[in-house]
Amino acid sequence: NDVAVLTVDPPIVYSAAISPVCLPPFNNAADQFVGKDGAVMGWGRLESGGVQPNALRQATVQIIPNADCNAQYGVGTIFKQQLCASAPGKDTCQGDDGGPIVVQAKADSTAWTQIGISSFGIGCANPDFAGVYASVAFFRKWIDTYMKN
């Protein structure tokens, strides 16, 4: 399910350039972020089978209903612990798996909420298949359990 919890020692020192990302509350509803714009970022390939960039890349994609994503991949492929996002010519690619998809916490806020973790897709920016992400909200109880340990 692409979820890991890491302990960092020594603790990270936050600054104007380094800040934490918010996590959404637990919610097992699949479509709670549908229609929102999400930012994906990573060091993955620039196109399927292509080269990796020299700088961190970012793209904006839109969260789509899981029913639409299931229609693309085949019924029973996408589950409530996943969410999907797409935009013309934009996507995550090989090397981006495990990276974030974040949404602005509020329209005029500088805070971001990580709603998903890049999981898989068919090709990169394939117009017939959205990118698939593990839902952070679905796994929030599991994340909280391991963060307490």
Regions flagged by a language model, labelled:
Residues 1-149:
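Extracellular "complement/coagulation-type" protease architecture
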